[in-house]
Design a protein with these regions (language model features):
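Membrane-interface helix-loop junction between the first two transmembrane segments
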Residues: 23-40
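Alpha-helical transmembrane segments of multi-pass membrane proteins
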Residues: 17-28, 58
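Hydrophobic transmembrane alpha-helical segments in integral membrane proteins
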Residues: 1-15
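Membrane-embedded catalytic scaffold of the fatty acid hydroxylase/desaturase
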Residues: 48-61, 81-181
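Loop-to-helix transition at the N-terminal end of transmembrane alpha-helices
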Residues: 8-9, 35-48
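Helix-boundary and loop/linker segments of multi-pass membrane transporters
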Residues: 2-6, 33-37, 77-84, 118-119
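Membrane-interface helix termini and inter-helical loops of multi-pass transporters
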Residues: 66-79
Length: 181
């Protein structure tokens, strides 16, 4: 694959995190009650552990899976003959729809909620909350997404764009930024 999707994904993730941390420090919606440095260290540690887990055991095999599915011509998008911008846009819609229903399932299915509630256990929400996930949730989520990749069949670039967008959206949604009325 010509594009360095893995490196690009990391740049988008870290760049978004730093941007929202900076904006939060300038325009906080709520004053901090606890020690922010300690909180950022904790969430950063969770993220570091999860990054190793995800990168080694999930992300690389997953990206290879996306490439394999595309090469085999599997998935609805392949069967419809989608390509170019149309494939990317429709893949974003399809993957986002899956992500929405997966997130709803994490709140409604007791087994999934056991893992997802670690994310909701945060007492003060800020951009670092977007880093707080139970490793079990990451594994289960990746398995669910792998099945959806098989069904839909996005191209690797569509997958990369989706992962970047969902990461930036999650960081924004969790940010402690005072937005104007």
């Amino acid at each position: 694959m010509e594009l360095d999707l893995d490196g690009g994904r990391l740049v988008v993730f870290v760049g978004g995190l730093l941007l929202f941390l900076f904006i939060e420090s300038l325009f906080p919606a709520r004053n901090w009650q606890g020690n922010r440095a300690r909180r950022l260290f904790f969430h950063g540690s969770v993220a570091a552990f999860n990054t190793v887990l995800v990168r080694v055991f999930i992300y690389v095999p997953f990206l290879l899976w996306v490439v394999f599915v595309e090469q085999q011509g599997w998935g609805i998008s392949r069967w419809l003959g989608l390509d170019g911008w149309l494939e990317i846009v429709l893949s974003l819609i399809a993957l986002d729809a899956f992500d929405y229903f997966w997130h709803r399932a994490n709140h409604r299915v007791p087994f999934l909620w056991r893992f997802h509630k670690a994310h909701h256990a945060d007492n003060e929400m800020d951009v670092s909350t977007a880093l707080r996930f139970h490793p079990g949730e990451l594994v289960l989520s990746s398995l669910a997404k792998a099945s959806w990749v098989l069904v839909w069949g996005p191209t690797p670039i569509a997958w990369f764009v989706f992962e970047g967008m969902i990461s930036l959206c999650a960081q924004f949604h969790h940010s402690n930024i005072d937005l104007p009325d």
